A protein has these predicted regions:
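A short, N-terminal "cap"/entry segment at the start of jelly-roll beta-barrel domains
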Residues: 1-47
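Ligand-binding loop in jelly-roll beta-barrel domains
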Residues: 34, 98-122
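Conserved short histidine dyad/triad with adjacent acidic residue
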Residues: 37-67, 97-101
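Structural motif
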Residues: 49-53, 73, 110-111
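Glycine- and acidic-residue-biased ligand/ion/polar-headgroup-sensing regions
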Residues: 58, 67-83
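Short glycine/proline-enriched turns and hinge-like loops at secondary-structure junctions
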Residues: 66-68, 86-87, 106-108
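Short acidic-glycine-tyrosine-enriched beta hairpin
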Residues: 82-102
Length: 122
């Protein structure tokens, strides 16, 4: 069966597989953090906005940090434990406002996709 609405693809695109692409040491909070890995899938370091994937090894904790922008992420695998004790699991979506201060740790390991953005215009 054909679809008469199909058009041929035009323009650039980038496809990244989260499981096949090498990760880099995580450094979005300034210094490199051991056992935390970053995959830049659309993050603009100059503007500090865009998409990324973070993989945390079991037993790892992030450095305490404050969010300058909105940060949102979705847990894809494992669990993440927030500094207030909240346990985030696969499928949980989290949204932080600018000025939020926390750190996170994982006992199981964790894979998440995140997005940092400027506030929406009102």
């Amino acid at each position: 069966m054909s679809n008469d609405n199909t058009v041929s693809w035009q323009g650039p695109r980038r496809i990244v597989n989260l499981y096949d692409t090498p990760y880099e040491p995580y450094d979005l909070e300034g210094e490199v953090q051991d056992n935390i890995h970053l995959l830049n899938i659309g993050y603009d370091r100059d503007r500090a906005t865009g998409w990324y994937v973070i993989r945390m090894e079991p037993g790892t904790a992030s450095l305490p940090h404050e969010h300058a922008k909105h940060e949102e992420y979705l847990i894809l695998e494992g669990e993440l434990i927030e500094s207030d004790g909240t346990v985030l699991k696969k499928g949980d979506f989290i949204s932080y406002s600018p000025g939020s201060f926390h750190n996170s740790r994982t006992e199981t390991g964790c894979l998440l996709i995140g997005h940092d953005r400027d506030p929406y215009a009102e």
